[in-house]
């Protein structure tokens, strides 16, 4: 029996056109210490962003003046794209825009922004949290703001290291630079301990989408107008399966399926979460009557069971390639016309556009993650984990100042960095037509967040760590286990206990 899935509010209520793809940008590498980070510059210079005076302004008082005080942000090393502090003479548009964002904040508030980067990506989460314990936990007043890998923010809040943003002077959650659904999903007892949005360039790059190869589609004689399918809410799971059927060709003559062959669809195992959220499912909700956190009725539902069974059956056919880590390439298979559809984060777009290390130009389009049911009536875009979430440390020297800088960074990012990532880069430079750009708008406008994902590192009381994503992604899909109801029931009690802990500690 299908369960009713509630649809959330549309995210990012602004008219920013959606664009991607900067010229071979590399993640910023930095050294520990509140100084300037070193950014490896691309070989090609892109134009600086145009003025964006038509964008909404914040409500920060013009009279704010912190008299040139140093404001130090602790951030995680390893962010895929530049976000924190580029060099002043950076030659690419994104680095320039981040520099201008920071410069505007310094001039508006009369602060001197300094930065300290430490290891803190997926493989260094424990190291990052341990360092927080030695500084914030010891009340040393070293940092005014923390920008953490997304999985760390919930752990930071659970340890009592984060300030309730709603209680601060200048955080304005109703502004367009804070995604509606992120702020609403992360609120517990009317308190919000972290936020992200236009303040994090890496959030924008890590949205999931489906790339499709137009040349291969034409070669196969597929005449469906993909934009029309999306517009008419006909881009669903069944449609994708139908279009990808009988695309398989044994190109390398190796017996059985192999990465050298041609497929209708390809996906890497860590991206499977996108199909869960694209179907409108959640792991955690807020009880409308009590305000308490509960496991979403959709999480353990028969609908998820059905999706898993269909995914596993599909991945067993020659139509699809599910990669469990055997040798997944960043771009080669799609670039070489071996996949008709390829589900990836959007940071894949520059690699496809430039066909790095190849001489081949790729004629491609992008689509939102397909709906599960045709009558779902809404697309849902989830985000990969490598983006930043910002928190105010409990021992910040001046909470009001930290609140002002946080709001100003996000506000200036909305006007400076986001237009570069979206407008000055992909749409005006690389999109071949308005249809491609419109698809990016659909992807961004339907961003979805889930408290169970935001606090995933806390869900470790049962048999599995990070249970809110691990059960679906790894136990069911990677483990080729279709018995979802049994899997869920085995962890349900432990996950409910974690929600009680979160609710108690954050109220």
Language model region names:
Residues 241-244, 283-325:
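Glycine-centered hinge/linker elements that transmit conformational signals in sensory
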Residues 1-56, 72-73, 105, 142-144, ...:
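Gram-positive cell-envelope targeting signals
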Residues 356-428:
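Extracytoplasmic/periplasmic substrate-recognition and gating elements
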Residues 84-110, 215:
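Short, polar/charged alpha-helical segment
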Residues 51-88, 106-107, 250, 254-261:
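Immediate post-signal peptide segment of exported/extracytoplasmic ligand-binding proteins
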Residues 108-189, 358:
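Extracytoplasmic "Venus flytrap"/periplasmic binding protein-like
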Residues 74-77, 140-146, 150, 188-210, ...:
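Extracytoplasmic/periplasmic solute-binding protein
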Residues 391-403, 413-507:
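Conserved C-terminal helix/tail region of periplasmic/extracytoplasmic solute-binding proteins
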């Amino acid at each position: 029996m299908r369960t009713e899935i509630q649809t959330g509010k549309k995210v990012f209520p602004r008219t920013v056109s959606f664009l991607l793809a900067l010229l071979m940008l590399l993640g910023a590498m930095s050294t520990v210490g509140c100084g300037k980070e070193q950014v490896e510059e691309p070989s090609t210079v892109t134009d600086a962003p145009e003025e964006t005076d038509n964008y909404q302004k914040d409500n920060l008082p013009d009279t704010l003046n912190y008299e040139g005080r140093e404001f130090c942000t602790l951030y995680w090393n390893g962010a895929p794209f530049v976000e924190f502090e580029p060099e002043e003479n950076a030659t690419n548009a994104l680095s320039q825009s981040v520099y201008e964002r920071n410069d505007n904040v310094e001039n508006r508030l009369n602060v001197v922004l300094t930065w300290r980067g430490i290891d803190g990506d997926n493989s260094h989460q424990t190291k990052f949290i341990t360092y927080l314990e030695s500084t914030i936990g010891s009340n040393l007043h070293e940092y005014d703001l923390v920008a953490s890998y997304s999985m760390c923010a919930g752990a930071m809040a659970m340890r009592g290291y984060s300030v309730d943003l709603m209680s601060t002077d200048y955080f304005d959650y109703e502004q367009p630079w804070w995604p509606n659904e992120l702020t609403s999903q992360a609120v517990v007892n009317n308190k919000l301990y972290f936020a992200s949005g236009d303040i994090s360039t890496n959030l924008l790059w890590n949205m999931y989408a489906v790339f499709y190869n137009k040349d291969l589609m034409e070669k196969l004689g597929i005449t469906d107008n993909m934009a029309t399918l999306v517009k008419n809410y006909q881009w669903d799971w069944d449609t994708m399966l139908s279009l990808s059927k009988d695309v398989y060709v044994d190109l390398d003559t190796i017996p059985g399926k192999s990465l050298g062959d041609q497929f209708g669809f390809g996906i890497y195992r860590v991206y499977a979460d996108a199909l869960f959220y694209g179907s409108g499912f959640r792991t955690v909700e807020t009880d409308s009557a009590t305000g308490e956190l509960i496991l979403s009725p959709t999480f353990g539902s028969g609908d998820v069971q059905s999706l898993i069974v269909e995914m596993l059956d599909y991945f067993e056919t020659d139509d699809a390639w599910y990669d469990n880590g055997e040798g997944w390439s960043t771009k080669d298979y799609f670039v070489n016309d071996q996949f008709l559809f390829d589900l990836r984060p959007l940071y894949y777009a520059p690699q496809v556009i430039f066909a790095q290390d190849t001489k081949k130009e790729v004629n491609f389009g992008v689509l939102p993650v397909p709906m599960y049911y045709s009558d779902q009536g809404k697309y849902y875009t989830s985000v990969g984990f490598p983006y930043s979430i910002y928190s105010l440390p409990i021992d910040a020297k001046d909470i009001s100042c930290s609140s002002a800088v946080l709001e100003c960074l996000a506000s200036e990012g909305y006007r400076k960095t986001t237009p570069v990532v979206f407008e000055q880069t992909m749409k005006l430079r690389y999109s071949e037509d308005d249809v491609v750009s419109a698809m990016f708008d659909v992807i961004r406008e339907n961003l979805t967040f889930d408290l169970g994902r935001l606090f995933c590192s806390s869900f470790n009381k049962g048999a599995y760590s990070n249970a809110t994503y691990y059960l679906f992604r790894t136990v069911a899909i990677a483990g080729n286990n279709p018995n979802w109801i049994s899997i869920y029931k085995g962890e349900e009690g432990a996950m409910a206990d974690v929600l009680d802990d979160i609710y108690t500690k954050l109220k």
